[in-house]
Amino acid sequence: MATARRLDVVASHVRSPAASAEVEAYARDLRRAREDVCALLRETNCNPILVRLAWHDAGTHDARSGAGGADGSIRFELELAHGANAGLVKAVNYLRPIKERYARISWADVIQLAGATAIEECGGPRIPMRYGRADAEGPAKEGNLPDAEAPYGDGASDAATHLRNVFHRMGFDDREIVALSGAHTIGRAFKERSGVTEHGYGAKNGTKFTGCPFMRARADAADGEIGMPGGASWTRKWLVFNNDYFHREFLSEEKGQLLWLSTDDALTTDPGFAPHFMRYAHDQNAFFHEFAVAFAKLSELGSRFIIGPIVL
């Protein structure tokens, strides 16, 4: 996939030459930062954790109060210590050298740039992103992200109700909930992080899809460290972004080796979710299009743009 694309700068409200020059400089650094993220992905195959970081930074948003959102607050130690964010300090540390190299780019933009690039570089759709976000000055409150299994923090009696409580608070509808859940097509869960699986760190604790320290998950079968082996994945090729997550119910022979949570199951059984789940299983193009739009919306929740916005 091409790693350098034209930057269109949308800055109609910028009037002075000095302000225009600032936007252009920011855009140049975004372009360079994206190249550095691509290099990081090629070296480490860290696509899933960068997507998780972008989601967890944005997913604290409350549309009613305007609090939280994609504002870089997850960089603060207090927020990284939230239970839902276990393991994400690793993702922040992956991005820290890039942030330091391009100091004018906000943490909020670096995190969302990395998440979108991670999706695109493992076969996913082009995300219509905008940049120029301001950074938060402190951490978001704990408790706004969804739980994978009961008991649910919002007191919901079932997984479908819990998903709606969390995502409707952010402004997403049922179709968008299912589309965003498709991000589980990449990545793994670990006993030491979420606790939703018995599979933990290390090759001996992985499944047949996650136990090898080298690449079995990439589409090109190229060698490449995956970092810590282990954990459990939702799909067999967990470094390839496609619609395999929605085929999970048809892979009965692999059920013991693949992760499937109550919140995943709700998408296949709830009458409001299931039609979208089945549609994405049969139409990857529809999934890609609707995921890209929903992810772009997610990436701007609670964001305050102080430059541009700049369209990559």
Where are these regions (language model features)?
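Catalytic cores of secreted/periplasmic or lumenal enzymes
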Residues: 6-312
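N-terminal chloroplast transit peptides
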Residues: 1-5
